[in-house]
Swiss-Prot record:
Gene from which this protein is expressed: adhfe1
InterPro entries: ADH_Fe/GldA (IPR001670), ADH_Fe_C (IPR056798), Alcohol_dehydrogenase_Fe (IPR039697), HOT (IPR042157)
EC assignment: 1.1.99.24
Record's protein name: Hydroxyacid-oxoacid transhydrogenase, mitochondrial
Similarity annotation: Belongs to the iron-containing alcohol dehydrogenase family. Hydroxyacid-oxoacid transhydrogenase subfamily.
Organism the protein comes from: Xenopus tropicalis
Key words of the record: Lipid metabolism, Mitochondrion, Oxidoreductase, Transit peptide
CDD domains (UniProt xref): HOT
Lineage: Eukaryota, Metazoa, Chordata, Craniata, Vertebrata
Amino acid sequence: MAARRDQVIHLLRQLQRASCKCPAHSHTYSQAPVTGRKTEYAFEMAVSNIRYGENVTQEIGMDLQNLGARNVCVMTDRNLVELSPVKAVLNSLVKNNVSFKLYDRVRVEPTDKSFMDAIEFAKKGQFDAYVGVGGGSVIDTCKAANLYSSSPGADFLDYVNPPIGKGKAVTVPLKPLIAVPTTSGTGSETTGIAIFDYEELKAKTGIASRAIKPTLGLIDPVHTLSMPERVVANSGFDVLCHSLESYTALPYNMRSPCPTNPINRPAYQGSNPISDVWAKHALRIVAKYLKRAVRNPDDREARFAMHLASSFAGVGFGNAGVHLCHGMSYPIAGHVKTYRAKDYEVDHPLVPHGLSVVLTSPAVFSFTALMCPERHLEAAEILGADIRTAKIKEAGLILADTLRKFLYDLNVDDGLAAVGYTTEDIPALVKGTLPQERVTKLSPRAHSEEELAGLFEASMKLY
């Protein structure tokens, strides 16, 4: 079945490449709607309003006043609560006479239990607006709190992605939510995605709906100057893979099924010509600035550029989606044993999200290049590879080698073995990947359980 799907997709791509190249017909995604079709014919872009600028956080009190907010929930984590980003938010709220309550119990890499704790706080508070100050964990938790407090009769699994949850469409009105990201990675301020660990299954899953997108994202690059080295690196790897995966994802008009109602069109729709622009631009910024941002905390140009790149990639993948690196990362993070990442002040073992994503990237892109080799070569070139004499059939190996060098230069752990996994863990890792259909089905190349096992095995060592 997987082989048959690959053959069909490969044939369609060949037809696209051979089609007329005049300006009127050269768009490889152009396709008219066909009544009753099984594959998609449309895509849509949904992003938050974004405001960028140094010290722009000082405007948040005025924003909440303009929204008519009288009782605001501010969410953050215990590492941030005494630091300047949260202080800047609270000072602005006080200055503008906005009443608020502070919730600082967000868990880094949230779980269903930590989500439910925040949801209970939100339900009791009867808030009319939300503010999330932190990384993706904080902003995602804030999205969930807003959703379930606005739909108090819903069961927790109602809105969770299938097959773990029911994946119901969000039809209730939500309260305004302003996101203030303090890391340069998740792009959560731009997306309708909230990710968490479902502890019963030791699997990562999430909620995906345009309805939970933040109303406004305040992109204040000053907040990145205090990020520790490994947090900068791992956050940047998330941007890297968001860009690569969305650019190489299954094209939107090859995705099925086509929804019978636009409300059922998924947030992750497949690569498309608008997301492509954002993904490639973000990738260029990563190539130019990530190493500088990691190595020199005083390099304001690099740190500020990476903060924007996170949002750029968020616009891209928030509509196109991601695929195998992310799908495989969820069990890597969820089955963590004793590994504790440097520069993360947490009370539990942790493989940071960006690290769990990037460790499989050489193996994944070596595997997926068969279906869209030109895009893989283009990505390798952006990351510094010389492709002038490259052959199409070498695309996967070239991108994989380019990624390995990039990761080696940034002192990334030597594969899954370095974060505590052995080949004996592969069956559990594969099992944890299988429920991630929301993202894995966007891989440009179909895959079997055996092939997933092979990718995990190939990722045990990188160098």
